[in-house]
């Protein structure tokens, strides 16, 4: 938790922004709290391989603090603690952010009804959006004012297809490891499909940060990891237990109880613009208050992740301004 020295110049109590971090990895050393000075660190993983942990959003934490907002950053379940990080498990990510909000407000001796918002991009966007969905049922005492979610992976099977063969294809191993830890049926259904190289893929994922993954497993086609030569997406389609596990995490099924800004670049090469737009439309159809932004971005080399990463730095400042406006005035007018 970061407590600002700058005064809050808006109305009422100092607000709090809970950040869901973007993909850091699955190894314990990848946790946001493990980054040196909360910025980044280089070292060795549990298995002795070089590893790097970078806080992509650090400048945005500072931006929020300069505005006088309190900042809380959640490690998410399994990062820096026993067990696999349950990557893109939206239900657990929602609980992690909401619990972090509760704990942070208590630690700061802030009123339980102090204004609160969520922010994140990519994995963090999904975590923030899921927290917005579950706030009313899981933490109704919290005064959630709004959420900013950039490039959230709202449809996991669709995201799997676009990630496969990309620079960050190893993150599929993070997801499989996490879901396998929660469901023996899922674990058995998946593991019987992998060849020895596929098993190495999963074992390596368990101790890797995302930079390590790009260097060691970047652009891996999952057809090279399975016994049958099928892609993971093809296996998902023929194995109901796997598909149902992933579909259970899809977002857009329940309306957030506060305004949400969603942003996605039409050129995003990892998390499709269409899935984010569809989810925004689903919320609108349920009566949600949604601002959807077709974010500016780049169109460079497909599947490298560049066109996914650039909008983070273009749109997060807009999202933070949106949250600060929600704290101080009528969001619809602003």
Where do the model's predicted regions map?
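Catalytic histidine neighborhood in serine/cysteine hydrolases
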Residues: 284-302
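Primarily recognizes the serine-hydrolase "nucleophile elbow" in alpha/beta-hydrolase
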Residues: 103-107, 114-168
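Short alpha-helix in the alpha/beta-hydrolase fold that links the catalytic acid
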Residues: 272-282
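Short beta-strand/loop motif that positions the catalytic acidic residue
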Residues: 262-264, 268
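Conserved small/polar residues in nucleotide/adenosyl-binding loops
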Residues: 327-334
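Accessory cap/linker subdomain of secreted extracellular hydrolases
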Residues: 153-253
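Alpha/beta-hydrolase active-site loop
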Residues: 87-107
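Short, surface-exposed "cap/lid" segments of acyl-processing enzymes
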Residues: 8-63
């Amino acid at each position: 938790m970061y407590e600002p020295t700058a005064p809050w110049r808006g109305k009422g109590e100092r607000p709090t922004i809970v950040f869901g971090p973007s993909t850091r990895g699955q190894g314990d050393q990848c946790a946001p709290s493990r980054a040196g000075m909360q910025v980044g660190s280089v070292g060795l993983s549990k298995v002795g391989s070089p590893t790097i942990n970078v806080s992509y959003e650090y400048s945005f934490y500072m931006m929020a603090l300069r505005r006088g907002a309190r900042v809380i950053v959640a490690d998410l379940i399994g990062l820096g603690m026993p067990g696999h990080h349950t990557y893109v498990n939206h239900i657990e990510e929602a609980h992690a952010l909401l619990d972090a909000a509760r704990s942070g407000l208590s630690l700061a001796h802030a009123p339980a009804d102090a204004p609160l918002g969520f922010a994140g991009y990519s994995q963090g966007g999904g975590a923030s959006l899921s927290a917005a969905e579950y706030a009313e049922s899981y933490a109704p005492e919290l005064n959630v004012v709004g959420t900013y979610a950039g490039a959230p992976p709202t449809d996991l099977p669709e995201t799997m297809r676009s990630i496969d063969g990309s620079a960050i294809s190893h993150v599929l191993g993070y997801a499989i490891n996490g879901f396998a830890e929660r469901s023996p049926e899922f674990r058995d259904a998946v593991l019987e499909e992998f060849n020895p190289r596929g098993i190495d893929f999963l074992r390596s994922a368990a101790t890797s940060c995302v930079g390590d993954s790009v260097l060691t497993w970047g652009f891996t086609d999952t057809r090279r990891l399975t016994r049958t030569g099928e892609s993971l997406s093809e296996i998902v389609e023929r194995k109901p237990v796997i598909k149902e596990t992933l579909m259970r995490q899809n977002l857009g099924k329940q309306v957030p109880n506060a305004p949400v800004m969603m942003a996605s670049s039409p050129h995003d090469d990892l998390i499709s613009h269409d899935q984010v737009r569809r989810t925004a439309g689903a919320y609108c159809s349920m009566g949600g208050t949604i601002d959807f932004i077709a974010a500016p971005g780049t169109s460079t080399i497909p599947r490298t992740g560049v066109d996914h990463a650039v909008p983070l730095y273009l749109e997060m400042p807009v999202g933070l301004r949106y949250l600060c406006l929600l704290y101080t005035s009528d969001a619809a007018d602003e």
